[in-house]
């Protein structure tokens, strides 16, 4: 069945009959295969997929013949299809029994295909040629141009060990995680929130000593009263930092009596709430003289400041009055001091001016006297010269 793979020299029109006639002659030169066509785009498929498709298209052909033709054409789909069609047409006139008998013989394979398949590095030693994967399961041969094979991504292991190591370290770098943050981290406390909402239009007040809690009423009157209270508390806090004002408060008998009443009220309320606190209060008040012996000034000042924390409304009013009186006194003292300094500076300037006048006057008198004494001497000299 060598005529299945050879083309007679009589032309393309009688190719089938000429091939059948020349089957007995073994000296006919093999003609060119059907894959010598004008240059066109070569389509390649995956090997197993192409073999399955060709077996479906040519069920009468043997699997080994299809594989040999495909390998001879280096996986070119169009050339393989043309050659298989030509072989199928040429083998159509012959009987199936002869075809089956001669399919296993080496004479049924063209010598070109046989040479390529029987080379030392055959399919047993090397894998089949690489074919591009099929784009479609159906209609594989309908596409005019094949898709380009996808380029595999570059392997990281194959790169150099210089820069990639740093990149790998950078990729594997995990930032250190912080521990659990406190509950009040970046949070506004409720009292701060109330003060911000109440005083949104003005400057933000700080939490001064004795500052009352912010009222919930949104009215302008309440806001004004809060502002006044805040300013008064700030002034009182500043006054309490003045040692002279503190000494004046300790010398004021009425204020000390009111402060003592407030302290007793606070202690009675505290004793009602808990009986243990009463013993602590009495124990705290009894050793005051003992501590006063060690450092009486510090202990008295600390005790007085502790009493100021429990002031009532009446005592607070007295404190405001005393603070106003103290501020007026200090203003008067400052104005008197400025006045005295001004007078002293003016008196010093006048005295220096008088001293300068006296010095200049004495100098002028001496010059005038010296000139009067020199005048008659000059006249006598002139007369003698004449």
Swiss-Prot record:
Protein name per its UniProtKB record: CUE domain-containing protein 1
CUE domain span: 46-89
Pfam families: CUE
Tree of life domain: Eukaryota
Compositionally biased spans, kind Gly residues: 11-27, 199-209
Annotated organism of origin: Homo sapiens (Human)
Region (Disordered): 1-40, 147-172, 195-225, 367-386
Molecular function via GO: ubiquitin binding
Lineage: Eukaryota, Metazoa, Chordata, Craniata, Vertebrata
Biased composition (Low complexity): 1-10
CDD domains associated with the record: CUE_CUED1 (cd14366)
